[in-house]
């Protein structure tokens, strides 16, 4: 093959001359652009490029071995510790030339070892022969000297000398034999050591592609690096075997893959065998008893608190968490291992699995605090607590205003009561405490609280209006609280007043007047003119005497929260109705989730008071937060314990709420599948008092439908803050303020984010506007409206449109491009579109009643005489929330 130049070779390889020259230089051949290249040089270049482009020369393996170590802890619980052992090993792949070189070196090393072995053997033999000669010469010298020494002795000693000579010759021969055996043994050990070292080095450097998998390869993933891992395992075993303290250390060590399969007793016995190998004594088999699986289930006493997670319940029963989850699924409840479940569910699961359940009460601290109270002994008569209930605008507040001789109703927004007002009134016959409840439908929970805190219910019914829905609800609340009812028939001075109608309607709900044999007193009053007010007060006091109301006046007070709100200057304020004892300024009170010291007390007139007895409503300041309306108020001795109880109640409420929320059932799963199609109206609600927040939230949530849901993102008492505005911006919510306003920082966020902020003072307007917002999210309803009928009189053929129906418009108007139906014998046979509409060969847009026209139906030619063409249009009707 002729030589070619660098330029020609570069053109053949389709590369640049500079790149080819560089490649030759990398291969160790210096060339210029005009030099020629021989076939040998080309082959050298090709070998160099193949070696350069071959696969990676190094392979790095990283192995992680994970295991779990169970450490026993206190209380029968065990702690699991995850152990991870990481190993990293690098294998170098030799190229073929390197492999040949290593093979040649290996062969040379073997020959050198053989020659060294032979030389060592010959050297040992020479040394043994020389040693024997030296010993024989020394022996001969000693014999000669001995012979010269004893030459003058007597002849009778000759025999002993000869015997001694024979003995020493025999010893010399024995010594020579031992020296030869020692030399041979050393030679064999040296040869065996050299051969073992050579075999180990050869195995470390070999790269086998067709190695058989070892027994423990099933414990690892089969990958391309399987053989390398086997080599690593073999090397690890050799290293660890060298560290064993006895000959049986390697045999006694368990295999890698089966380290969890052997029992603890087997491992102890193996370790004992290793320890006993050094001293020549082997310890007997371990006397420790191995764990045997129990033949039957162990029934345990399981102590369950008010809430517990599934994992904790499994630990108490000494079973796996998956078994508890399976048992819960059999009972119809789905749970995860970290989910909090309530006490009843945990009891059912534990009893289902055959364990005995011990229910633990966690409110011992609370009971101890409540029992450590000085409540006094003697009970004294107290004033009745009267709640005025009734329908909206039936005159409840006006009636109470006349009694108090004030004008409170005009101060309420919209003239309706939106808070519970608590007042006490001194009369000639004694004191009466009045609670004025809202009558609007949204304030159901407020009325229920009023009924529970009261002794007597005054049911106000307008004589001209009769029994209304909230009147019925007030009757139900009174019956549920088992409170006597005094009926005040108001607006008796109106011409259209009909008291007998009121009696008849109330009798249907179990409220019978005394003259009809019932237990309820009926009093005719007029809040405007003041008619019958004294009779009403007398009836209330008479009913109170019948009830014999008594309370302990001395001692630590207890009562109920009627209303609560957050005042910007004073902080959390709670309206408290004292039931028993006397509440003093400076007392430590526990109120639901809140606690604190009474910093100040005010009566309903805003005057500072130092104490309040039974049936007296007061406003207290100094609580840690705004309590929920309806919470129990209790005076305790120790503020530290009160704080602990309040924090315990908060945690308990949070756990119970979480357990209730996470309790997922099968039927809810299918309901959640279609939630993506539901529109949501997000609202951030702030109001002036806690009762209004509760009432508005309940009312708005009741507006939710299947298509639009109302979601209260956040709610609270007090003004609208920057946090509320940020929350509304993040959740795309409407900011609603009920009798509150936004501060300066909140207004900046609202303007920057263009949030929808709305202020309300009347609950009617708030609910109506939320309804309007929800209505805008409803998809419109599509309705078909017939606009005209045309009767087919004759059918013509048209080359452009096909069958043309000659029609007479009998009703309405026929318009072009409107959808139509073709009716035959009042049965719809086709539904399509009107394509052509002509009158006297002129295209028209519409034909009115009584006119003739030609109609071409799009993609339909089976029009017959006598058919009726019905023209309609589709209109969208906006739906509203009822």
From Swiss-Prot:
Residues 28-296 are annotated as: Disordered. Keywords: Acetylation, Cytoplasm, GTP-binding, Initiation factor, Nucleotide-binding, Protein biosynthesis. Residues 390-397 are annotated as: G1. GO terms for cellular component: cytosol. It is found in: Cytoplasm. The keyword Acetylation applies. Residues 415-419 are annotated as: G2. SUPFAM superfamilies: Initiation factor IF2/eIF5b, domain 3 (SSF52156), P-loop containing nucleoside triphosphate hydrolases (SSF52540), Putative DNA-binding domain (SSF46955), Translation proteins (SSF50447). Residues 526-528 are annotated as: G5. Residues 490-493 are annotated as: G4. The modification N6-acetyllysine is found at residue 800. Residues 244-258 have a biased composition (Basic residues). Residues 92-209, 259-272 have a biased composition (Basic and acidic residues). Residues 381-550 form the tr-type G domain. One of the essential components for the initiation of protein synthesis. Protects formylmethionyl-tRNA from spontaneous hydrolysis and promotes its binding to the 30S ribosomal subunits. Also involved in the hydrolysis of GTP during the formation of the 70S ribosomal complex. Belongs to the TRAFAC class translation factor GTPase superfamily. Classic translation factor GTPase family. IF-2 subfamily. This is Translation initiation factor IF-2.
